[in-house]
Amino acid sequence: MAIHLYKTSTPSTRNGAVDSQVKSNPRNNLIYGQHHCGKGRNARGIITAGHRGGGHKRLYRKIDFRRNEKDISGRIVTIEYDPNRNAYICLIHYGDGEKRYILHPRGAIIGDTIVSGTEVPISMGNALPLTDMPLGTAIHNIEITLGKGGQLARAAGAVAKLIAKEGKSATLRLPSGEVRLIYKNCLATVGQVGNVGVNQKNLGRAGSKCWLGKRPVVRGVAMNPVDHPHGGGEGRAPIGRKKPTTPWGYPALGRRSRKRNKYSDIYILRRRK
């Protein structure tokens, strides 16, 4: 990813560092509209996820997470920006005339060839079952349920590692540090997701943040007591509690949010960091 630094001509361009290399030119048969409703609200209109709302209109790009074009080679035609995710996507033209979007693997360029199947080379962008991969392979877009499509390691720069195979299961180390068992016939894509330097971008101004649908963040201590447990007081008062809390009074900053006794706990060998 090429980071573009602006010449300092205005306050908004002084700190801006954006990626201006990848453009978006989606195909009409692979996009459809989506109705954005809620803006962080639930069915009763109550805010459940803060700092969301507004933003530019988006068209959803249909991504092929299943990679079920078996044993048919495809060629990367374009690398495009997707407003619905922080990773890039690339358009694939398959030999049978099929055209699909997939997540852009790191290092893939226009003209490269990819293929999906059981006996395919262990090369970047190819999709194959975990049982056919050697130990230590870097992978992304990993299935949890066979045939459902990739659900793990799909964000920009995400990569998991195959560390063991035993019986019907394969052991993976996920980007979060979690070590987990996956059915070894599940499909995964070789390589790392592209756009690794996404965290190096600096939008430079509040307006660019608003285009992404992200509202301003206000500290709890700057609110009134009716709005936040940290609010109120005379001047710069402390929060008045032993530990910080969410706007709804639950413990914040480090409390684990995973449900207890979940059915998938038996597949997790080591929890995430």
From Swiss-Prot:
It comes from the Eukaryota. It is found in: Plastid, Chloroplast. GO terms for biological process: mitochondrial translation. GO terms for cellular component: chloroplast; mitochondrial large ribosomal subunit. Keywords: Chloroplast, Plastid, Ribonucleoprotein, Ribosomal protein. Coiled coil: none annotated. SMART domains: Ribosomal_L2 (SM01383), Ribosomal_L2_C (SM01382). Residues 1-22, 223-254 are annotated as: Disordered. Signal peptide: none annotated. It holds the Pfam family Ribosomal_L2. GO terms for molecular function: rRNA binding; structural constituent of ribosome; transferase activity. Belongs to the universal ribosomal protein uL2 family. Part of the 50S ribosomal subunit. This is Large ribosomal subunit protein uL2cz/uL2cy. It comes from Drimys granadensis. The lineage of its organism: Eukaryota, Viridiplantae, Streptophyta, Embryophyta, Tracheophyta.
